[in-house]
């Protein structure tokens, strides 16, 4: 392993043969060093049994850091805690210690005696993270030995990979159960009577990587936690919740929303007492290619190619490197390009680079995790799956290809570098889009701005309805529960609506689930838009290649699309939307594909409005109709458009939330927008606004959609719509409405600062535009936005 302990942050670049001059013609735009952090330690609490202390010492833990001690003490006293500190700061110990101590005989504060055989539920967003924690807990349990009334700690996983006979043992004997939201939803809560022993003794619920529960997924988890608390109360329990999280804007408020408690009941522990080596962060701009895009706009080199080049150079120099990118296809492409480049230098190095993403089979995932942990792999290109706390130490460098969506994720990813105590390096490679361009030119927006809050909305009726049905099937909903908005945030009206639809029956004792032969929990789609997962099948031998959610199916698995899995490319031959099957065949094309969509929008209800002079900003409910109408084949490495193919797929409708801006033609004219430029000005402003909204929310531009029109039938004016791409909304458009002035100002700054003449992907072009980025008027869009801001100020 090669390290760079030199205090000069440019040393690693020089050793790896990378450009080391900030500014100028090279790619390096900014260097920032996160300083080293010294350890601050604390004594073991007196209530921790000697056997537990001895077990931790045997595992290499001699003492506690201050944040671990603070969190553990509060949890032991019965207070909910969110421990929001840096990557590799030992959050697991801080959240697990009170539960392990209670199992081994510690008396919780305020209790006359310890509850017999205390149980602990550990919840993680992924099976991989739970498997990693299980391995560590099993070793710790062996070191602790047969302590306390339970005869020791008995950890076990309970997930989709657990065999039936093992499941019975877990229910009857395990006192630390590690699972994920999916299994809690369909396997544990609906079968709570089989878990009566466990729930009667449940004292602690540990939620790992709590910051990852945001948006629609987070709203589902918030309702799942309310169902869990309800079942626990039925068996006489009132568990204490412990959250482990990356840093966030207001962790106590976010965690309180997640678990369904009042904010004052949650303690946020944010002062990190663990040591960390310095990390040098390089903001990296892709160079321009010789090709041009829509409207002859200049094109930068592909983000995946730039990241693959960095991965190759770093691996060649001996640096263990992890490259993050948001998309599955991106991870596969980076790994493939890097392997091909390394094969020209050293065939052995080429075999030590791989991709990691969701959609792999269980055996593939575990093998990759082990290979990276043990150092058999030198380079890995990953989706954010490895952003989470899987124990992978000894990494020298991290490449972050494109903005990961939130500052929390950004700092979580770069925190992977330097985990072995040596100086680390992190590269942020800016993509060719407005948000990345803004951050490249405004590094203070990364390093000197508060980390975002996790946006969740458990009152969203589209999310809440199936959880209400699941709750009613688990236990009838009592009349007093219907009035408890803390338990059921959507309110009593949703119960009445579900009763009217025939899904619930009203009885004197409350509401009962009306379908005797159905599983209500199976109607809850935690990780998708409500449609079931699609299975990807190899047409040649019928083997299962992978899976994907329904939201991905039309854009990524339409006939003619290229689907990539483990470095292998497949051509989609058929998309069976009725049976949820994608039929593919192996190919090796020199191109990738990108879908095009068209969209129309109808205003259903205006919930809020504010006037800015002659302009107005609105928020409300809309119905969006969209269709995938075609796709482009684009050359690998250059993104040159090779062909444009039509598609005939059925349209889909979406009822969601939106914010929209209306601007009368007279005001646009006064701002310098001539009539023939109005469509292009609106269209360009819409694209740039969508690109910048994730800066203010915890969303992603792919979670957000937009429509602009020179005369909308519902508003009667030129209008820009920005909407949430999820049924019922996800809180992003509402956040945009609340922060409209800041959002529009940031958008104007980005367009103004882009050096292109008439628009490019770094300012007003969109990678998912269904109209081939036409018409677009960059300068007119800037006049429009500046006119809005002047009206607001006036």
Predicted regions and their residues:
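Extended Lys/Arg-rich polyanion-binding regions
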Residues: 423-426, 432-449, 457, 462-478, ...
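Conserved interdomain linker/interface between the two RecA-like ATPase lobes of SF2 helicase motors
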Residues: 252-259, 264-327
């Amino acid at each position: 392993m090669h390290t760079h302990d030199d205090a000069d942050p440019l040393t690693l670049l020089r050793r790896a043969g990378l450009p080391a001059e900030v500014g100028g013609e090279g790619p390096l735009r900014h260097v920032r060093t996160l300083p080293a952090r010294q350890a601050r330690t604390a004594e073991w609490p007196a209530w921790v049994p000697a056997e537990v202390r001895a077990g931790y010492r045997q595992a290499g833990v001699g003492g506690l850091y201050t944040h671990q001690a603070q969190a553990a003490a509060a949890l032991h006293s019965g207070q909910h805690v969110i421990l929001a500190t840096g990557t590799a700061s030992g959050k697991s110990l801080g959240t697990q210690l009170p539960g392990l101590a209670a199992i081994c005989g510690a008396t919780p504060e305020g209790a006359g005696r310890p509850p017999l055989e205390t149980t602990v539920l550990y919840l993680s967003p992924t099976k991989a993270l739970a498997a990693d924690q299980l391995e560590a807990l099993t070793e710790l349990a062996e070191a602790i030995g047969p302590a306390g009334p339970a005869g020791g700690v008995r950890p076990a996983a309970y997930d989709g990979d657990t065999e039936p006979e093992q499941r019975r043992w877990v229910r009857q004997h395990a006192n630390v159960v590690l699972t994920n939201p999916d299994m809690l939803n369909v396997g544990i809560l609906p079968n709570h009577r089989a878990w009566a022993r466990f729930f009667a003794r449940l004292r602690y619920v540990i939620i790992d990587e709590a910051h990852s529960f945001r948006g629609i997924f987070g709203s589902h988890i918030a309702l799942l936690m309310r169902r869990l608390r309800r079942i626990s109360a039925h068996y006489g329990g009132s568990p204490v919740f412990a959250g482990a999280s990356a840093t966030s804007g207001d962790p106590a408020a976010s965690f309180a929303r997640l678990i369904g408690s009042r904010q004052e009941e949650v303690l946020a522990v944010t002062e990190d007492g663990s040591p960390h080596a310095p990390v040098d962060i390089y903001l990296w701009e892709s160079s321009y290619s010789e090709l041009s895009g829509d409207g002859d706009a200049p094109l930068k080199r592909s983000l995946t190619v730039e990241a693959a080049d960095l991965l190759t150079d770093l691996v060649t120099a001996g640096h263990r490197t992890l490259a993050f990118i948001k998309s599955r296809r991106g991870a596969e492409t980076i790994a493939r390009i890097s392997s091909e480049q390394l094969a020209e230098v050293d065939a052995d190095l080429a075999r030590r680079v791989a991709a990691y993403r969701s959609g792999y089979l269980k055996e593939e995932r575990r093998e990759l995790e082990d290979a990276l942990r043990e150092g058999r792999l030198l380079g890995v290109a990953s989706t954010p799956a490895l952003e989470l706390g899987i124990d992978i130490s000894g990494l020298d460098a991290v490449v972050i290809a494109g903005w990961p969506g939130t500052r929390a994720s950004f700092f979580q990813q770069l925190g992977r570098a330097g985990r072995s105590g040596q100086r680390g390096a992190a590269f942020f490679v800016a993509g060719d889009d407005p948000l990345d361009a803004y951050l490249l030119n405004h590094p203070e927006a990364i390093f000197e701005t508060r980390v975002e809050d996790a946006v969740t909305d458990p009152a969203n009726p589209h999310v809440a309805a199936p959880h209400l049905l699941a709750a009613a099937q688990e236990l009838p909903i009592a009349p007093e529960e219907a009035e408890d908005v803390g338990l059921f945030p959507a309110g009593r009206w949703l119960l009445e609506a579900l009763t009217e639809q025939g899904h619930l029956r009203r009885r004197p004792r409350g509401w009962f689930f009306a379908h005797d032969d159905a599983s209500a929990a199976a109607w809850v789609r935690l990780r998708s838009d409500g449609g079931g997962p699609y299975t990807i099948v190899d047409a040649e031998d019928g083997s299962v290649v992978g899976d994907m959610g329904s939201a991905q199916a039309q854009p990524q698995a339409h006939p003619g699309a290229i689907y990539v899995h483990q470095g292998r490319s497949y051509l989609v031959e058929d998309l069976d939307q009725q049976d949820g099957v994608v039929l593919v065949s192996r190919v090796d094309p020199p191109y990738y594909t990108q879908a095009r969509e068209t969209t129309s929008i109808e205003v259903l209800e205006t919930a809020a409005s504010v006037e800015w002079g002659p302009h107005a900003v609105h928020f409300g409910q809309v119905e969006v109709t969209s269709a995938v109408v075609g796709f482009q084949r684009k050359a690998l490495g250059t993104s040159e458009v090779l062909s444009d193919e039509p598609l005939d797929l059925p349209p889909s409708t979406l009822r969601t939330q939106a914010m929209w801006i209306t601007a009368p033609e007279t005001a646009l004219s006064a701002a310098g927008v001539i009539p023939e430029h109005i469509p292009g000005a609106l269209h360009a402003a819409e694209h740039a606004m969508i690109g910048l909204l994730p800066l203010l929310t915890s969303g992603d531009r792919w979670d957000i959609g937009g429509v602009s029109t020179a005369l909308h039938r519902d508003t009667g004016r030129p209008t820009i719509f920005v909407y949430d791409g999820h049924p019922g909304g996800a809180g992003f458009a509402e956040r945009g409405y609340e922060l409209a002035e800041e959002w529009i100002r940031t958008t104007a700054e980005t367009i103004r600062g882009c050096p292109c003449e008439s628009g490019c992907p770094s300012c007003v072009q969109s990678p998912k535009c269904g109209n081939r980025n036409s018409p677009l008027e960059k300068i007119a869009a800037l006049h429009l936005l500046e006119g809005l801001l002047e009206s607001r100020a006036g």
